[in-house]
Amino acid sequence: MGRSALSCSSSPEASDSIPFRFPTRHFQLPIFEGFPVKILILPDSFKGSLTSSQAAAQIESAARKVFPEAQIESFPIADGGEGTLEMVQKASGGAFLPIEVMGPCGQRVRSRYLSIGETAIVELAEAAGLGLRLPGFSPMKTTTIGVGQIIAEALHVGHRRIVIALGGSATTDCGCGMAAALGTQFLDEAGRPFLPTGATLSMVRGIRLNGFFFGKNAPRIEALCDVDNPLYGPQGAACVFGQIGRAHV
């Protein structure tokens, strides 16, 4: 068996390696003459703790302490959840536009979206993400209304294409809050409008759609996600991803 590119040894005597020190042992990273160490850092977010940009900064800081002569490049990545806006902005430019909206638990939160020409990139996690949950608040009672408020503002200032990054949601309302913020009405059995949450979706008996989203002048709406789960069923989004938010489904 050939020598591993990353080997573990208790005695860092080899002249072609740099000891990478951990509390209980040394790792040897071979250095080949004429080839400097190059490190590429590509972290996604650490759900509920670090965004991809924060993770990249921490990893890069530690790497520079161990390998001060290394060529290090950081490219935070995202899958449609936390950090998507920062990833797109770093790759494509654009300007962050701040906005205050309703958070998933009804609180006011400071959010933002990314403007690139006539396109607005909206990150659901910036308005209804897991990091915005209040302690003890059930995801069956959370709302995506803040996401709709961002979209409404983006349309109001002239954006004609809306791209929504769907990951990292703290909600189970099937986007009803988002639709309500854009003028859609959800009706109960008596025909009265109300705002559905995951706990009250079964009470919806009728829907009045906002005509703004139909016709030749309707904005273009696109969604970003990295899964193909259906809405419901054993492998459905409600069952699989609702449990990440601690919903009992």
Predicted features, each with a name:
Residues 5, 13-16, 33, 169:
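Acidic, Ala/Val/Gly-enriched low-complexity intrinsically disordered segments
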Residues 13, 22-23:
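Charged/polar low-complexity intrinsically disordered segments
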Residues 26-36:
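Short, Lys/Arg-enriched N-terminal segments with co-localized hydrophobic residues
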Residues 37-166, 170-248:
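N-terminal loops that bind phosphate or other acidic moieties
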